[in-house]
């Protein structure tokens, strides 16, 4: 089964397009997990228990795991999420040349999909694109304000903006390799709509709906492809919803359920 097929099946089973980000910031972890052998894993396990019924995917960000204990925590997290029947999309924004890209792509033996950076071109992405049954989400129009610095540049040779060109190339890669999607932020709803009109077949990962205040209605209307496959991510708005209370895991579950219901009203 391809990743997009797997994701579509999960979306149908959970009646959800919610991506729950798993970014266990050590400075914000609750006191009752801080003394665990692997605090990030202890935190993630409680979050997964509380939210998995509402999640189409879990999305750990690699930056929160890049030390020896962190990688152990990530391995446990991925295995546990899979045990709950939920795919894992690693937000790593990888790309490099030659052997380095091939090494980065090895992670797809353990997770179901990954985010990549298109700046180095197709050859830097081929090790990811050629992985069987693995999803590849290409950064296109990101949710941060600084994304305008480069993504909005006009390409005179193509009569389009850079982010539009990325979308077109991603559609070509999808036609050749399959299982390619785009990362398009909910904080730029006009661009989100424009990109969807260019590439109706691609699934989008749409961040920025939670703490960043993005447009949830636009995220659903334009984030899903013709088959209703796509993801709307919230991280801090879910996992730290109960940050200042003892029932923090239950608060995360409530936040994920509320987001699912909110998004489903627009599906």
From Swiss-Prot:
The keyword Lyase applies. GO terms for biological process: 'de novo' pyrimidine nucleobase biosynthetic process; 'de novo' UMP biosynthetic process. CDD domains: OMP_decarboxylase_like. It catalyses: orotidine 5'-phosphate + H(+) = UMP + CO2. Gene3D superfamilies: Aldolase class I. The active site is at 93 (proton donor). One of its GO terms (molecular function) is orotidine-5'-phosphate decarboxylase activity. Keywords: Decarboxylase, Lyase, Pyrimidine biosynthesis. Pathway: Pyrimidine metabolism; UMP biosynthesis via de novo pathway; UMP from orotate: step 2/2. InterPro entries: Aldolase_TIM, OMPdecase_AS, OMPdecase_type-2, OMPdeCOase_dom, RibuloseP-bd_barrel. Its EC number is 4.1.1.23. It comes from the Archaea. Transmembrane segments: none annotated. PANTHER family: OROTIDINE 5'-PHOSPHATE DECARBOXYLASE. This is Orotidine 5'-phosphate decarboxylase. The lineage of its organism: Archaea, Methanobacteriati, Methanobacteriota, Stenosarchaea group, Halobacteria. The gene is pyrF.
